[in-house]
């Protein structure tokens, strides 16, 4: 358990405010007419860098490290976890196609069509990188990384992954949507484990990019 006597109160209060805002914004996804879930990433990034500023004064190691990227990648078990979303992306599409008879691929395309330019490959590659990096800074770097200072890891991992999955809800049948957000939850748990082991959201971002790129490539081949 964290030693609360050693935690800066300003950082704790700032973290709680950021967590609350991200949670509320994610939950608005349940009501399509009210959905403001797209703001969760912006809020998470903002609070991440505010807390990084506080941490720098306290000489606390950053959760976004370029210089130690390769050293963090080589930490025990990290590379295997980074590559795991390649398998989950393929399995998600294969199982989804078997269960929903092609409707799952259409559902994913519909969910991502407004954010990704499938007809412009160079732009699509940039969008995949930016989207994954932004989500990792917000959800792993801030929500998971900063909340882990005041709460147990697995509680933070499950809560952040649940909200992350809810923020990706898209219209469709109950079964289709439930399967989609469950697999997003699974991937999010993997990213959380990567962050826990590496302490660097650039590493979880790499895994996120690889996983998304694999899924999109398979979708384009399938379509």
Could you tell me what each predicted segment is?
Residues 1-73, 89, 93, 97, ...:
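N-terminal, membrane-interfacial amphipathic/helix-forming hydrophobic leader that caps
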Residues 3, 7, 29, 33, ...:
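Membrane-helix interfacial "entry" motifs
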Residues 7-15, 36-41, 72-81, 119-124, ...:
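Residue-level signature of transmembrane alpha-helical entry/exit and packing/kink sites
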Residues 15-23, 41, 45, 81-90, ...:
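Alpha-helical transmembrane spans of integral membrane proteins, capturing the lipid-embedded, hydrophobic core
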Residues 25-26, 51, 56, 92, ...:
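Membrane-water interface at transmembrane helix exits
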Residues 33-40, 106-113, 176-186:
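Non-cytosolic membrane-interface motifs at loop->transmembrane helix junctions
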Residues 61-131:
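Juxtamembrane helix-loop-helix connectors linking adjacent transmembrane helices
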Residues 118-223:
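Transmembrane helix-loop-helix hairpins at the membrane interface
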């Amino acid at each position: 358990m964290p030693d609360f006597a050693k935690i800066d109160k300003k950082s704790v209060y700032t973290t709680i405010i950021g967590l609350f805002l991200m949670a509320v914004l994610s939950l608005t996804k349940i009501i399509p007419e009210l959905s403001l879930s797209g703001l969760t990433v912006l809020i998470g990034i903002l609070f991440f860098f505010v807390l990084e500023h506080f941490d720098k004064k306290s000489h606390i190691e950053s959760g976004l490290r370029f210089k130690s990227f390769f050293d963090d990648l080589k930490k025990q078990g990290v590379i295997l976890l980074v590559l795991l979303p390649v398998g989950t992306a393929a399995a998600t599409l294969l199982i989804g196609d078997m269960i929903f008879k092609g409707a799952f691929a259409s559902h994913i395309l519909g969910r991502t069509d407004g954010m990704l330019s499938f007809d412009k490959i160079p732009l699509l590659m940039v969008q995949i990188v930016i989207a994954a990096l932004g989500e990792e800074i917000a959800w792993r770097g801030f929500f998971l990384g900063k909340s882990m200072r005041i709460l147990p890891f697995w509680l933070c991992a499950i809560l952040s992954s649940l909200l992350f999955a809810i923020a990706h809800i898209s219209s469709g049948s109950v079964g289709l949507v439930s399967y989609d957000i469950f697999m997003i939850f699974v991937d999010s748990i993997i990213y959380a484990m990567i962050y826990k082991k590496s302490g660097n959201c650039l590493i979880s971002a790499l895994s996120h990019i690889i996983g998304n790129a694999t899924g999109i490539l398979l979708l384009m081949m399938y379509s």
